[in-house]
């Protein structure tokens, strides 16, 4: 696992982040998996490796969580190929106290609480299928309104 993480960390495209939009596609060109969220502050924690293995991602996120106790939020892991919300989600979305890298490679914690979309292969207890919406607005570091799951 560690070797895979280190290898993937060396692939620059896996760390690409888009700014000023709802999506933060940190695995662009590597797995096609996109993350969309909002940030409220930054802290330091473990980067997410370039992988489609949801369980492994969750274990990395749990490590990330431990660096920022007391924070709450959600992470959407989706299979959208672009930033226009086209496509059907097929990977789970989980209610985690978690954090993701921002455009400077720092980490912010999330503030959108939500119901979650789950896949057949990675659904966790308590997940509920739900459509996407722009109704969840957090207080990010800039004035952007981020897309979240209601």
Swiss-Prot record:
Say if the entry is tagged with keyword Signal: yes
Q: Which superkingdom does the taxonomy of this entry point to?
A: Eukaryota
Signal peptide region = 1-14
Q: Which UniProt keywords apply?
A: Signal
Question: What protein name applies here?
Answer: Plasmin C
Organism source for this protein?
Physarum polycephalum
Task: From the UniProt record, report the name of the gene that encodes this protein.
Answer: PLSC
